Amino acid sequence: MTSSRPRLTSEPSDVPDGEQAQDPRTREEQAKNVCLRLLTVRARTRAELETQLTKRGYPDDVSARVLDRLTEVGLIDDEDFAEQWVRSRHLNAGKGKRALAVELRKKGVDDEVISSALADLDPAAERQRAEQLVRDKLRRERLDGTPENDVKVTRRLVGMLARRGYNQSMAYDVVSVELANERERRRV
């Protein structure tokens, strides 16, 4: 199936290719334009932008100067990016601390910045989000009261939380409590 939207490609002025981009100022201007275009789509880390510039063939010195300037004017801010990412992915995708740390590392965020961003995540809020995820899933589960079914449901729900980056002991505790609550709710 083909998309009706035109595919975005690099404009000729964005790609350095020997003759066209010999002047360092021109190269820097082109690299800056690439970064600005990428930043208009969504916030990005310095490492993500550096990767894009390298992929497009810009020399390291040009990339470093452009990225330093964008950082200096506040368009690149890994700390702010990490805080926004943690808040957004925790609330919208239900991710736990471990999964969030992995995602930020993949985006090239420094471990110290990751630790700082995750420190803002309240353990009570993390547990609350896990409880909500389990409650939402439990409403769709068939609970027949047999031990085999309970084990299967518990395993499935703990696995779901583990894949989202929640601590296994907390996940098991949340599932146990919410499973008991759901059984009680269905009895009434």
UniProtKB/Swiss-Prot annotation:
Entry keyword annotation includes Cytoplasm: yes
Pfam families referenced in this protein's UniProt entry, alphabetically: RecX_HTH1 (PF21982), RecX_HTH2 (PF02631)
Gene3D superfamilies: Winged helix-like DNA-binding domain superfamily/Winged helix DNA-binding domain (1.10.10.10)
Region (Disordered) residue spans: 1-30
GO BP annotation list: regulation of DNA repair
Keywords assigned: Cytoplasm
Cellular localisation: Cytoplasm
InterPro entries linked to this entry: RecX_HTH_1st, RecX_HTH_2nd, Regulatory_RecX, WH-like_DNA-bd_sf
GO cellular component: cytoplasm
Bias-annotated ranges (Polar residues): 1-12
Cell inner membrane is among the record's keywords: no
Superkingdom per UniProt: Bacteria
Coiled-coil intervals: none
UniProt cross-references to NCBIfam families, sorted A to Z: PRK00117.3-1 (NF001056)
Stated family: Belongs to the RecX family.
Chain's role: Modulates RecA activity.
Full protein name: Regulatory protein RecX
Protein encoded by which gene: recX
